[in-house]
């Protein structure tokens, strides 16, 4: 992705919501590599899908020869960003935030190259400059450059001020100053000339641009990526179980893969532009092939494969595909102990049973049958399988051989209704 037309290419992919002084930024990029940054506040112990677009934008810029700075907000994470939030955030302890900072740094690192010469990525933490700053320095050197009149007119703050049930504390009101100073500080330390972020960060970004100009007399820029929406109007990046996380311990690679497999046809080609590095030509060609094939589209499989590999690596992708293939075929022989652990984590409904349980009661407990009588009928009708093998004995009681890796049993009614039994010793 050549620097001279990078902004244009991002726009063609639908990745630009707003940009400050677009012509001047394009001119600056055409002159040669710049340093840019994106901030990630540790408000949880993992990033989620909402963070992926700006994170991948950092990578797109690095691939084009620019120097990315990934800023984790060890200080701002202690405060909480009020932007477009309906209520005050819960303040977390410094110990918790420090742990989350480290986890998020580890999550960001694989997406960027930290050893590639002049445009090697930099990992930064804003606690490094705020941790030792006293309140008088903050008020004199930063606060004096901010107009309260302008701050309360920012859309992100105005929404909170206009709510009768929720005001805004001075703590959260001050967040705008902290993020603004981040930009000025990174400009001074690393020559950072561009901040990218989600569209909800526009007010914070423009504050940083203004403060950098006042403190250092430097022209810097801001670019926001759009809030990702689904064509049906529902929230992107959410499932019935909540947010889709990048941490495999919070959202398993299998569940992550399935999230993308289930993308609607109306969204999938747009998401390929947002979340993959396929060229627009390749995406358009895939769309044309899908439309003319008369078969189920390939695009969801391509999207799931590329994004799962990006986030969970080749091993995570292979496991997710193996689990998907095994469940579709009803054959569990390929599944590993880790695969079953993923299913127990969040991959399918599950129950815990004590050893010695009979099949009829297990079907009732797993909500695969409404009663023991109905369970008996299902078994006798050859509709029930255990670990992929049909079971027709209505009086069957589970034995040791049914416990895969000594721990799990896969129960199935019909072709698609599964439950995973985890055995209690």
Curated annotation (Swiss-Prot):
The keyword Nucleotide-binding applies. This is Tyrosine--tRNA ligase. The gene is tyrS. Its EC number is 6.1.1.1. A motif ('KMSKS' region) lies at residues 235-239. It comes from Erwinia tasmaniensis (strain DSM 17950 / CFBP 7177 / CIP 109463 / NCPPB 4357 / Et1/99). NCBIfam families: tyrS. It catalyses: tRNA(Tyr) + L-tyrosine + ATP = L-tyrosyl-tRNA(Tyr) + AMP + diphosphate + H(+). SUPFAM superfamilies: Alpha-L RNA-binding motif (SSF55174), Nucleotidylyl transferase (SSF52374). It is found in: Cytoplasm. The keyword Nucleotide-binding applies. A motif ('HIGH' region) lies at residues 42-51.
